[in-house]
Amino acid sequence: MCGRFERHSALSEFSKVVEGLMAEGIDPLPPSYNIAPSQAALVVRHQTGAHRVDSLTWGLVPGWMKEPGKIRPINARAETIHQKPMFRDAFRYQRCLVLCDGYYEWKKLANGRKQPYHLGRTDGSPFVMAGLWSDNAHAASEGIQTFCVITTPASGEAATIHHRMPVILPRAAQTQWLDPSVSKTEQVQELLLNGDVDLSVYPVSTFVNSPANNSAKCAIRLAESATGAN
């Protein structure tokens, strides 16, 4: 799964990752090294013929849900996303890209402790995770726009930490992923198979465990000898 991530790169850096990224008129969120569920994050959507950046809340609330409860999924499985009522409509017409510099997973050690790890590109560059978004007019007095992150079975180094990982879309698949006219299940599912899995994994301090902690310290590499993994 993906239950925490970070985004500190400027939008100008993400414009090198997402083709045709439009950030004009956007009041960008400040960098966040510890984005947690229910918090706001930056996503890219296809709107008025362009790829536009917006701030949405993490935890999907479908537009048809008139009385949103506590169940606000932060992840959706790529394998079954087209079948679940919670995600089905968004899967066809409301897909997005979640701006990210890295995400965190917790690995259970032999001593019972859970050690947090940071996962990101090997060269340290930013990337985008495949997501879904929704606009719900019933969730609050002014409505609420939300998103979730799509996950897939983990591979490579990521699989040594957790059995799931976010779908990281390469540039070649992004335009079609954002295009609502691409709505056939087979077409969209095919895009999810193109995930980029070249990730670097390293341990970080348990400082990241608390969502209240939000500084660069969350993503600093911790020496393996300090994790108690051996």
Name each model feature, range by range.
Residues 1-230:
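Short linear sequence motif anchored by a di-proline
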